[in-house]
């Protein structure tokens, strides 16, 4: 069976595009929330008659959905903008848009820095893209960064996958971590109603989607802003209740959620994840530091001991669960002993994956003004050491998969080998496997396949599908 028999699943909104229409190009920087916002904005553009360009330099409208979580991400945006500003000077008909967190942070000052811009819009205005572009078409330069109630999303997003989809459930962040710019650029928490979330998931299931990731900046804070108290005296709307509410959506085989905050990760939530069969055994729970004094300086609102209890409870209920996290090294005042405690915690927890970052001072955050900043050389050295530890631990965690059979959701064709499919296990391991089983059965993207793991690497697995065992 040749690879040409494999189906390349195209999201419905990408099919049959008329190349004679005005075209757009979106470049997304940063987190999953930005990726979900970009999908919605692409859907708005296509509902306006735009089609996706084949290349950025061919597009009639270029939109950068930006990230300001660290300085290097922000500087990359300005590099891209410089190139497009020259295009705009050569082609006044080009529409140039900056969306997302850099737009929210800089506002009108972006127009002074890049006068060629047509539209500057913060993340709370993503669903207003059509209205804002209409103002641009009337000859205005538009800045939309005021605090705004996020309208319920009634657009059809242009999904980047036809199998796995994002669904936003809560926008914004009410935390005040001393290093983080997110609350000032994404605004206060705004939770969507559970009925609207379920309706969106039902629509995705009808299109053939198999896996949904529920998204929020602090997703386990979901529902704090929604009214309602139960007879037991607890909030009526929590992430736990939401998982129960959407778990039986027909056609959806897997549920994930991200990103969690240790402050709100409850035993009740853990028990629901263990009891609900569609919830995958993978949890992304940032810890940021292994030192309590630093966690207090960061205003994280929990201790290392609480974090340990959460992980212990997860592994008690779901022994094979994978845990990923975020960590910052080089935070102001971090001593060598405090840094070593972070290394020790990484070893102790045996994380499956850790996203590491050197502390980067951000505008309008308390930590950026402190006098005890660490030299860049110290940050770089600590980051290098911690990355080596993370990679070693990830490989050691993956070794236990050798020879096991894992359920893998085939998400697409391996771009490096057209005879292979690629997908993820329930524990979020990227896995490559032959599209053809030993008995000649050809699996397709969207199939749930039992795969025997033959080889492991630090951040991926590869294996062989068992004979004729596509689960769906």
UniProtKB/Swiss-Prot annotation:
One of its GO terms (cellular component) is cytoplasm. It catalyses: N(6)-dimethylallyladenosine(37) in tRNA + (sulfur carrier)-SH + AH2 + 2 S-adenosyl-L-methionine = 2-methylsulfanyl-N(6)-dimethylallyladenosine(37) in tRNA + (sulfur carrier)-H + 5'-deoxyadenosine + L-methionine + A + S-adenosyl-L-homocysteine + 2 H(+). It is found in: Cytoplasm. GO terms for molecular function: 4 iron, 4 sulfur cluster binding; metal ion binding; methylthiotransferase activity. Binds 2 [4Fe-4S] clusters. One cluster is coordinated with 3 cysteines and an exchangeable S-adenosyl-L-methionine. One of its GO terms (biological process) is tRNA methylthiolation. Residues 22-138 form the MTTase N-terminal domain. Coiled coil: none annotated. Its EC number is 2.8.4.3. [4Fe-4S] cluster 1 binds at residues 31, 67, 101. It is an enzyme of class 2 (transferase). Residues 399-467 form the TRAM domain. Residues 159-396 form the Radical SAM core domain. Keywords: 4Fe-4S, Cytoplasm, Iron, Iron-sulfur, Metal-binding, S-adenosyl-L-methionine, Transferase, tRNA processing. HAMAP family: tRNA_metthiotr_MiaB. Monomer. This is tRNA-2-methylthio-N(6)-dimethylallyladenosine synthase. It comes from Synechococcus sp. (strain CC9902). The gene is miaB.
């Amino acid at each position: 069976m040749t690879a040409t028999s494999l189906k390349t699943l195209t999201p419905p909104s990408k099919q049959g595009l008329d190349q004679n229409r005005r075209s757009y190009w979106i470049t997304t920087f940063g987190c999953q929330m930005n990726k979900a916002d970009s999908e919605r904005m692409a859907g708005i553009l296509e509902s306006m008659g735009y089609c996706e360009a084949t290349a950025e330099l061919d597009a009639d409208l270029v939109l950068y959905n930006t990230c300001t979580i660290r300085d290097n991400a922000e500087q990359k945006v300005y590099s891209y903008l410089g190139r497009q500003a020259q295009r705009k000077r050569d082609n006044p008909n080009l529409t140039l848009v900056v969306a997302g967190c850099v737009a929210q942070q800089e506002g009108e000052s972006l127009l002074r820095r890049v006068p060629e811009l047509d539209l500057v819009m913060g993340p709370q205005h993503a669903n207003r893209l059509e209205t804002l572009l209409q103002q641009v078409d009337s000859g205005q330069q538009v800045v939309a960064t005021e605090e705004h109630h996020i309208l319920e999303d009634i657009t059809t997003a242009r999904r980047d996958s036809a199998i796995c989809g994002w669904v936003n459930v809560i926008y914004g962040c009410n935390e005040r971590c001393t290093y983080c710019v997110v609350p000032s650029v994404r605004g206060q928490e705004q939770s969507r109603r559970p009925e609207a979330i379920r309706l969106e998931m039902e629509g995705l299931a009808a299109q053939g989607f198999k896996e949904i990731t529920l998204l929020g900046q602090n997703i386990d804070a979901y529902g704090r802003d929604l009214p309602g108290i139960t007879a037991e005296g607890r909030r009526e709307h929590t992430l736990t209740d939401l998982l129960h509410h959407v778990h039986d959506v027909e056609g959806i085989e897997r549920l994930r959620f991200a990103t969690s905050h240790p402050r709100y990760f409850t035993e009740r939530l853990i028990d629901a994840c263990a009891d609900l069969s569609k919830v995958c055994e993978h949890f992304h729970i940032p810890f940021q530091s292994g030192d309590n004094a630093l966690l207090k300086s960061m205003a994280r609102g929990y201790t290392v001991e609480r974090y340990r209890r959460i992980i212990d409870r997860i592994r008690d209920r779901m022994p094979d669960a994978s845990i990923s996290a975020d960590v910052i090294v080089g935070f102001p005042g971090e001593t060598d002993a405090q840094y070593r405690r972070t290394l020790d915690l990484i070893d102790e927890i045996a994380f499956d994956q850790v996203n590491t970052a050197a502390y980067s001072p951000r505008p309008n955050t308390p930590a950026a003004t402190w006098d005890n900043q660490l030299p860049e050389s110290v940050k770089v050295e600590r980051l290098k050491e911690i990355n080596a530890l993370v990679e070693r631990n990830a490989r050691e965690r993956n070794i236990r998969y050798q020879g096991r059979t894992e359920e893998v959701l085939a998400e697409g064709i391996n771009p490096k080998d057209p005879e292979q499919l690629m997908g993820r296990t329930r524990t979020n391991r990227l896995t490559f496997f032959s599209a053809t089983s030993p008995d000649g059965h050809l699996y397709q993207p969207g199939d749930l396949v039992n795969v025997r793991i033959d080889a492991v690497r630090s951040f991926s697995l590869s294996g062989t599908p068992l004979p004729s065992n596509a689960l769906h």
